[in-house]
Amino acid sequence: RGPVFAGLRGGVARLAEKTGAALTAQGAHLRTKTSVTGLRRIRNRWQVTAGSRTWDFDAVVLAAPAGAAAQLLRTSAPFAATRIRAIDYASVAVVTLAYPAARMPELRGSGFLVPPTEGFSVKGVTFVTQKWEWAARAAKTDAPKGVAIVRSSFGRYGDAAVLERTDAELAALARRELSTIAGLPPISLDERVTRWNSALPQYRVGHVEQVTRARDSLVDAPGVALAGAAYDGVGIASCIASGRQAARQVVRGLEENTVENHG
């Protein structure tokens, strides 16, 4: 039986790095750390505003979170904006802890999930250096005596009180609960808290219908497509499929527009 999980050596961030490098090599111009503040239709093109600068494009794929996309579409596609603005999100905080490997108990598997009925704040735990071979090698290189990396996540939809804690308080909570649940040492060598505010879209009953209606209404905003986890599912595979669908949509629209103009 093959492995249950698949990943990228060096972490998921490598996917964005390699994708950006591949696009740049093909002549694309990437503008990172640039916040888009406006989108409007002008003479059959889309004008994108970022700060004091503007650019004109034939087509735009909005792969931003639903709230940000709705804000950009509020004037040119108000119906779609209203529908996607209703998509709610949950926030999450990830606490990464480093432990001396020699003091770790014997752990089975690659981690575990914790249902809310158990009374703990932590909702999921990953034994990083046990799950990913590349992480284990990197940890051994950085700390020859051996380090075990454990990652835990906090924050459930509708119950974000735990996220109001400071980073130090969250790390202390993670250590306590991991010690109780899995017998991990009460003291860690190092810690890092990463917060992702409004990061996980929540799919209510009728989500697919609402997204379909929003997309159908974009016929009034030719050249614009929606893509991303807010609409088609979380996870890398779902986001890639969503992006490809959006790309095909705008390309098809551009081709049809070219035929009409030359027909």
Q: Which residues does each predicted region cover?
A:
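Helical element adjacent to the flavin cofactor pocket in flavoenzyme catalytic cores
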Residues: 1-51, 55-59
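Generic structural signal for residues in well-ordered beta-strands
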Residues: 30-32, 36, 188-193, 224
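Mid-domain catalytic core of redox enzymes
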Residues: 34-164, 168, 172, 180-181, ...
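FAD-binding beta-loop-beta segment adjacent to the flavin cofactor pocket
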Residues: 122, 133-145, 196-226
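Short FAD-binding loop at a beta-strand-to-alpha-helix junction that anchors the flavin cofactor
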Residues: 146-152, 215-234, 239-242
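Flavin (FAD/FMN) cofactor-binding core of flavoprotein oxidoreductases
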Residues: 156, 171-219
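Active-site-proximal substrate-binding core of FAD-dependent oxidoreductases
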Residues: 192-195, 251-263
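Internal hydrophobic alpha-helix adjacent to the cofactor/substrate pocket in enzyme cavities
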Residues: 239-257
